[in-house]
């Protein structure tokens, strides 16, 4: 099995643009002969690594950041997972992709 380990950055806090990017990367991997495309952890919409950085507590924009993170996170299953699945079907490939998943039973929870 040929596996494409894709190192790429998301379009920060923009799920729609990141899904388009991911679908393109999936297609590229398939054209290069991969049967499995593996994309980064929390690729949609981003991995909020700075939340644990030194001095992060002094950042005044956390409320806006967390709201945008939730708004751009993924319902599983949902429209975003369907678009990714369609890209995989179209190109005859499988993918593993990390997402921030919204919890539908508890709004505001990831």
For the regions a language model picked out, list residue spans one by one.
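Active-site beta-strand/loop signature of hydrolases that rely on acidic residues for catalysis
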Residues: 18, 26-55, 65, 88, ...
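Catalytic-core segment of enzymes that process non-peptidic bonds
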Residues: 67-110
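Extreme N-terminal starter segment of soluble prokaryotic enzymes
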Residues: 1-5
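Active-site catalytic microenvironments in core metabolic enzymes, especially phosphate/sugar-handling
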Residues: 60
């Amino acid at each position: 099995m040929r596996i494409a380990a894709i190192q790429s950055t998301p379009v920060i806090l923009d799920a729609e643009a990141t899904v388009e990017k991911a679908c393109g990367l999936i297609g590229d991997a398939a054209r290069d002969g991969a049967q499995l495309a593996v994309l980064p952890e929390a690729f949609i919409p981003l991995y909020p690594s700075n939340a644990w950085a030194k001095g992060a507590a002094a950042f005044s924009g956390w409320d806006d950041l967390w709201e945008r993170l939730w708004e751009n996170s993924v319902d599983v299953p949902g429209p975003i997972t369907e678009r990714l699945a369609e890209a995989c079907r179209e190109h005859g490939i499988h993918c593993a992709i990390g997402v921030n998943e919204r919890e539908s039973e508890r709004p505001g929870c990831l």
